[in-house]
Amino acid sequence: MQKIRKGDKVVVLSGKDKGCSGEVIKVSPKENKAFVRGINMVKRHQRQTQKQEAGIISKEAPVHLSNLAIADPKDGKPTRVGFRMNADGNKVRFAKRSGELING
């Protein structure tokens, strides 16, 4: 089970976007990287095709998972993630900072 998944709200711990938060769009577990909406934006030069015009577009670049932390559901501050079994016997994620369950 992954600590950071698609749809999670995360906080950037280091880098040019330190302190910013956003939603995870995609996770690459093999590369230990994630794409976060609005974080680590880079400009790419787009060649003209039949469907798209030429120009410079901004898109998200991947961020290493070690530079991300889940945002605590209670107050939005960065927290570590723990795992425990719920009453149904399913493994669930929880925020170690507040003890709140993390959706997903």
Swiss-Prot record:
Name by which UniProt lists this protein: Large ribosomal subunit protein uL24
Pfam families: KOW, ribosomal_L24
CDD domains: KOW_RPL26
Summary of subunit composition and partner proteins: Part of the 50S ribosomal subunit.
InterPro entries recorded: KOW, Rib_uL2_dom2, Ribosomal_uL24, Ribosomal_uL24_CS, Ribosomal_uL24_KOW, Translation_prot_SH3-like_sf
GO cellular component, one term: ribosome
The species this protein was found in: Bartonella tribocorum (strain CIP 105476 / IBS 506)
Biological role: One of two assembly initiator proteins, it binds directly to the 5'-end of the 23S rRNA, where it nucleates assembly of the 50S subunit.
GO terms of molecular function: rRNA binding; structural constituent of ribosome
Annotated keywords: Ribonucleoprotein, Ribosomal protein, RNA-binding, rRNA-binding
PROSITE patterns, per database record: RIBOSOMAL_L24
UniProt cross-references to SUPFAM superfamilies, sorted A to Z: Translation proteins SH3-like domain (SSF50104)
Family: Belongs to the universal ribosomal protein uL24 family.
GO annotation, biological process: translation
